[in-house]
């Protein structure tokens, strides 16, 4: 009985072993390996193989359940796959969501010393550093997509560094730390959707595995790796401060080794790549080795080269402490964007093409003079552009700009903010230029002052007395130079500041003040015509003068001026009109030819150079046709003209002269009288001898708005404009001559016509 049971057990074990051997033969492994496998290894490898067939149903040979068909193409494919693994300089592995290694290529033994059979089916956590377990868990964790029903299968990219166990001999293992070797793993996480029976569109997603390739990093010793022509090596401290560089860096980047020593690697890397470099630096300090992502290393003469670095921490042989960082760098491209300067070292290393001042000013040409010499001579050296500059842009105007209705813009008339190639740089041809723009015309940029014809045609730049040379140079830098023969559209009046009390929104502004139609025209001398500003009697309509100018409105201005600008210009126009009107009333009718000289005391033209005589004009009202004939006369350069005959020949006064440093100041005794948008007009039945009183309607709904605004150019607030004491003092301050100011305020009988009439401000300049 015992003999029978022993024989039965032996027979059962033999059958079991034969079944295991038959199962081992089915594994995609060489027969030399499968014949030596034990039962546990056969079960472990078989389960791993079955999991792999789920992940890749047709990726490992023929489809499941189909008979194998051998063909010459299949044999070639298998041989090619084995050769690819040999030339890969790494190994392929597939990890299940639970960390089990479903597949790993036999080339892993070359890098780790562990066989394929030993690793397959076992947990990867058994072969990686304990400090990397959390990172591996995070790599294997997937997140469900936002639109799950649209995606059947997707992949998530993964790139990470693992310290894997290495049992190779020390001379063949390369750099190991505590028996672990740093492996750079890159691949993807495969996610698949499994449909449910109840709802085929709302299936659950399952992580089916990680497919990755592992590369061992190069060794740290330079003698163990051959440096090719596109490679260079550097040694740095633990904070990436460069200590030593290979001489090949000069050929690849243009920098000499001594130019880079004592500076960190971050100093010479493109700003957009510093974050990736910082992450790699952190991994290097934690794990001892790292492969950086592709980053841009700045070249000496502008541009950059793409580089990838393999860095390793070298330990002290005596203390076993980290000593320094050794990096082998692969330069992958030639210099890109030559001439594009992104660092001050690049600019100082090469001759700057532009400077803020003339070429006689010394510039920084030597990068190795040190910080002390640069600080000591900072006053005499000009700073250059920290950004630059593509060589594809030229100084000529664009084709579309030649026929532009604006007559050329400063962005196309001047050079583009890009540097030219060294062969095209105009530094030797122009003695004065700018860091961002090259100017063909170096004439005056004092736009607030009149530009005579001689100032436009001469090469030298004239600084007027009220102009500061530094501000003029700043104007050339920001605005460009007005081109001779072309009408520039910029000027100092385009930058008038808004007061804090002014409405912030456009709607509030339009609702709080009447419409003012502003018309602009450019003289041949290169500045705006101030006298072309007219005031509209009511919102939405233009005055008599505004209709004449409507056809050429904004022909030269690139943008519509703001309403505060038009208000200031309209106010100045009416100041001039009222002053000349007072002078006409004061002077006898036979002495109208002398108004040009007598009107200067009331003029706002505080210029300190020769200028055309001011004009005497009559304020145009709605009932202008019924006034006396003498009120229609304008005196201009000794000629008696009608106000409609020479509207295009006004002599403007630039607003910048009012606030210029050397201009005459308006004394505190100067008083302003304004009647802005009141219910008043010039009565056709009013004579010069009548003296009507000011109606209380003058203090209408607009008083609250006017009280909030101050004219920054004169320093007076509008809240004092309607003071009776102010009006009385004004009449007493005009050289003792008596005349009644209220004679100019004609009340309109119809109070329903709101915002109709002209705005008048009277000032007495000392």
Curated annotation (Swiss-Prot):
Q: Residue ranges for motif Nuclear localization signal? A: 368-387
Q: Which residues form the Single-minded C-terminal domain?
A: 336-766
Name the InterPro entries for this protein. Answer: bHLH_dom, HLH_DNA-bd_sf, PAC, PAS, PAS-like_dom_sf, PAS_fold, PAS_fold_3, SIM_C
Q: Which residues form the PAS domain?
A: 77-147, 218-288
* Bias type Low complexity, positions: 373-385
The UniProt keywords, alphabetically, are: Developmental protein, Differentiation, DNA-binding, Neurogenesis, Nucleus, Repeat, Transcription, Transcription regulation
Tell me, in a sentence or two, what this protein's role is.
Answer: Transcriptional factor that may have pleiotropic effects during embryogenesis and in the adult.
What protein name does the entry list? Single-minded homolog 1
| Organism name | Pan troglodytes (Chimpanzee)
